[in-house]
Amino acid sequence: MEYYYYIIIAAVGGFAILTFIIIVVLRLKKSQKMREPLLPKEKGNVFVYKRDTQVQEKEEQVMMNARLYLRSTIYSLQDKIPKFGSRSDKVYFGVLGNSLNKLENDRIMAMVPVSKHWPIPLNSEAGRTTFRTIIKSLEIHPFISVPLLVDFIPEKHVAVSVRPFYADRGSLRDFIHKSKPKMPYADKYDTHLQLNEKIVSKFGRQILEALIFLKNHNFPYFHLNSANVLVDDQICLISDYENSFLGLEPRFSDFIRQHNEKIDPDVLSFGLVLFEMACGYEMENPHSVDISIPAHCYPEVRKVLEAIFKPFYGTPITLEELSKMDFFSYHKFKNLPLHRLTYTSRERDMMDAVIKLNKTFLSTNSKPNSKDLSQPKLKDLKKQKKRKQLVFTQSFEPIKMESQNGGGAAGGEYGNEGGYAISTSSSLPSNFLANVKPANSTSYSLLSNTTTNTTNTSTSSSLNSSFNSNVSTSYSNATTTTNTTSASSVSPPISSPPPPPPPPPPSKSSGPPPPPPPPPKSSGPPPPPPPKSSPPPPADGSRKGLLSSIESFSSSKLKKTKTVDKSGPLLKKS
């Protein structure tokens, strides 16, 4: 028995030694293979060689772009940080500033390519200036990380941003998983640790204040996640809000597409960040929102998450309502901005276009391609906005308002919403004319059928306007006298295309109507003509008949009417 026992032990030992030798040989071969240069050994390896060469050339091109850009700025390139973020096409570099304090010199520069089909006009200098101004305007808020430098390289279609690097804490995701910020992204989030309840409450309230500030200023974000929240000495700073202006896909885009109709995107993103802080890991997929919250989550945080993901009676909760909940309301901050930001019309147009583009991208059920032509363009958005402003003017043609006298020409046009002038012609409906009737309606021409009374009234008014203020007491009697004498002799107006002829003066002959008198050049009325005893000559179609009829008019023949002055105060007799 002992003989067989020794044989078994020797066989096992020999097998173990042989296995160890094989493992060592394989590892040595693997390390030697990695040290060898990338050369094609046979025809089957040509594709692999070309692929590796393209990757190497791409990295060299990225480094060259970074060096060329930083050549004319105040920063100097230090090194490239490999596999720093979750985006494969976004490259990070360590950058040194020129400050005397070494702790302030540590910077992170990010370079990300932008699609050529993205319609926001960043290729022009005016568009880049507007983009920088919008991004820099948020530096007044204490919970927003504003980049030290933000720019766009039109030749390379690459966006550049430089931010301070918080080496102690890093991002909120680094703070949750207790990992080093500069570790490779695939290796530093293996451990899962949940934060303290008080820290979750404090960080959550700080993020809420920043989101409410952006919401009140109609600022597009859509990119909230724990990796885009920086931690600096127990203070959370949201960052990377410029991604929405560059057409980058948000990390939570699948969640937003799934629950876009039920939950606001910013509220949903905040709920996912709160879930990661309280549970220690990121929510896996959009369908996990409808599943019950884990048992190890804090009870107070559970109430907030249920209010976000499972709203009461289907009413979605807002950011302001979340900030008033007991879990966040007891935190008070004194350094919040009190005044609102003001933006120019160009800046507001760019922000509105970014919001519409991102909402269109996130409202589709399937992920659109970068070359998808169904994505709305900036020209279409401007056309829609212009069409919305001109809704009122589509049913009316732009018509200039005409005036008979010189005094009404200055204020004769009334603009509507589209900037067109509205004419009081008979082509418009009568109820529309009643709404836009000017104050001095007798000075404007109407193409509708008028009666002789209105014509005579305008004639008597034009006659009486030639007198001075000394004969104002006889105005009413003159009007009645002219109406009674000319009602039977005036012929009806001749229908003619616009502009219509002026009403004829009172005359006993049935000749053609004389032309209207020229408008006076002075603003005041002319002096009254001297009375004449000669009878007025008959109207022969010339201006002489009208002038002689006006000169023959005498105010001495008018009778003064007795008027009762009721403008004074009423006194009671004792």
From Swiss-Prot:
What keywords does the record list, in alphabetical order? Glycoprotein, Membrane, Transmembrane, Transmembrane helix
Among InterPro entries, the record links this protein to: Kinase-like_dom_sf (IPR011009), WH2_dom (IPR003124)
- Can you list the disulfide-bonded cysteine pairs? none
Q: Which segments cross the bilayer?
A: 6-26
Which residue ranges have biased composition labelled Low complexity? 450-493, 546-556
List the record's Gene Ontology CC terms alphabetically. membrane
Residues with glycosylation annotation: 358, 440, 449, 453, 456, 464, 470, 477, 483
Residue ranges of region Disordered?
366-386, 450-574
Protein name, per record: Probable inactive serine/threonine-protein kinase slob2
Which organism encodes this protein?
A: Dictyostelium discoideum (Social amoeba)
What does the record give as the organism's lineage? Eukaryota, Amoebozoa, Evosea, Eumycetozoa, Dictyostelia
